[in-house]
Amino acid sequence: MPQLNPAPWFMIMLMTWFTYSLLIQPKLLSFTSMNTPSNKTTSTTKPTPWTWPWT
């Protein structure tokens, strides 16, 4: 079964991924984030307990 022999296609797959990552990575890193992170602390609210009708 030729599918079990990784020699013919494994290097092609690796080179394709390396090529795509080298071409796409600069494009993705050039995007700027529109929402700047803030130092605001998150406030947690305490939930009210559920009143069960049968208790």
UniProtKB/Swiss-Prot annotation:
Keyword annotations: ATP synthesis, CF(0), Hydrogen ion transport, Ion transport, Membrane, Mitochondrion, Transmembrane, Transmembrane helix, Transport
Presence of the UniProt keyword Hydrolase in the record: no
Molecular functions (GO terms): proton transmembrane transporter activity
Subunit structure: Component of the ATP synthase complex composed at least of ATP5F1A/subunit alpha, ATP5F1B/subunit beta, ATP5MC1/subunit c (homooctomer), MT-ATP6/subunit a, MT-ATP8/subunit 8, ATP5ME/subunit e, ATP5MF/subunit f, ATP5MG/subunit g, ATP5MK/subunit k, ATP5MJ/subunit j, ATP5F1C/subunit gamma, ATP5F1D/subunit delta, ATP5F1E/subunit epsilon, ATP5PF/subunit F6, ATP5PB/subunit b, ATP5PD/subunit d, ATP5PO/subunit OSCP.
Protein purpose: Subunit 8, of the mitochondrial membrane ATP synthase complex (F(1)F(0) ATP synthase or Complex V) that produces ATP from ADP in the presence of a proton gradient across the membrane which is generated by electron transport complexes of the respiratory chain. ATP synthase complex consist of a soluble F(1) head domain - the catalytic core - and a membrane F(1) domain - the membrane proton channel. These two domains are linked by a central stalk rotating inside the F(1) region and a stationary peripheral stalk.
BP terms from Gene Ontology: proton motive force-driven ATP synthesis
Membrane topology according to the record: Single-pass membrane protein
Lineage: Eukaryota, Metazoa, Chordata, Craniata, Vertebrata
GO-annotated cellular components: mitochondrial membrane; proton-transporting ATP synthase complex
Cysteines paired by S-S bonds: none
Cellular localization per UniProt: Mitochondrion membrane
Transmembrane regions listed in the UniProt entry: 8-24
Name used for this protein in its record: ATP synthase F(0) complex subunit 8
InterPro entries listed in its UniProt record: ATP8_metazoa, ATPase_protein_8
Sequence similarity: Belongs to the ATPase protein 8 family.
